[in-house]
């Protein structure tokens, strides 16, 4: 949920950020169609009787997680009553301009369209939910212009799990190049 939370924070307080790295995220306003994969995820999150966080994270990865890592994703939630936040987040993603969060995301985009500090997109090649989600950032954010943006080959949605060391190296290089 870094896009919906973090990018709105960058937009609200841009001077606090020397540079930004995003991966497999978005800041939708509901003006374009949501992907079928996202709509299915959104529906599932609201209707499934059981919400197995560790299993869901595992399924969104290309490489299988160990049982210990999957259990760590479940650990903050002793039972389903603790998962209200995790369940509601997908429903807060605007899929039409009338959605309550649409105007806040539109306002954030107006700020990001002026953000000229270094901005790196590192999206994976195997995430059906955010595939192509880097395009609006590459087109609209001035700080994203004129630099190479890596495609993280072999990564699913959770890059930190599938390609953690490779992603860390890209971020390290980006920081070094823009320091």
In which residue ranges do the predicted regions lie?
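Flexible "cap/lid" loop of the alpha/beta hydrolase fold
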Residues: 7, 11, 16-53
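Gly/Ala-rich beta-loop-alpha elbow adjacent to hydrolase catalytic centers
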Residues: 2, 6
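Short aromatic-enriched loop/helix-cap "lid" or pocket-rim segments at secondary-structure transitions
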Residues: 31-36, 41, 84-87, 132-135, ...
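Catalytic active-site module of serine/aspartate enzymes centered on a nucleophile-bearing elbow/loop
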Residues: 145-179
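Conserved loop-alpha-helix segment in the C-terminal half of the alpha/beta-hydrolase fold
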Residues: 119-155
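Generic structural signal for small/hydrophobic residues in well-ordered secondary structure
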Residues: 73, 86, 112, 121-124, ...
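Alpha-helical elements of Rossmann-like donor-binding domains used by nucleotide-donor carbohydrate transfer enzymes
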Residues: 8, 55, 72, 88, ...
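Conserved alpha/beta-hydrolase catalytic His-Asp/Glu region
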Residues: 30-33, 50-106, 110-112
